[in-house]
Amino acid sequence: GRQGFGYEVTSLKGHIAEILGLDKKHHMIIVGAGNIGRAVANYPSFGREGFQTVAIFDADPNKIGTDVAGLKVLAIDTMESFLDENPVDISVLALPVKSAQQVLNRLVEKGIKGIWNFAPTDLNYPDSVTVVNVHLSDSLQILSFKMLRAED
């Protein structure tokens, strides 16, 4: 910035978006159409930020074919063929612990490079894949700790 003038906000926002990789469109799939998967699919700002959900998969026959955020839930058995035909770089894992590692392995085999993991488990994956774990209980524990410190 220039002294007395500050920064040109539009230019600064553009540079920050570029640094964060938000100047590109990211196509993502969600694996798991339960509460967390539906919440992620319906989150309004992801699309504006360049994260476009292109498919949702589930293994539950009662969820397959239902509508979530304007997308029809697809059978998890069709995931690989979908990935063969559609460019996807991020997958959201919103599924039970028991199937998380197996699904991650299938995604890695199909070239997915980014995993946003909501399954409450740590996964094994190659260095070529970036995984961000979202453990909801960790966030609550941090909140509790910060509240306790604020009381001191």
Residue ranges and their predicted role:
Residues 95, 118-120:
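Short secondary-structure boundary segments
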Residues 1-94, 99-110, 126-152:
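Hydrophobic, well-ordered beta-alpha structural blocks that scaffold small-molecule cofactor pockets
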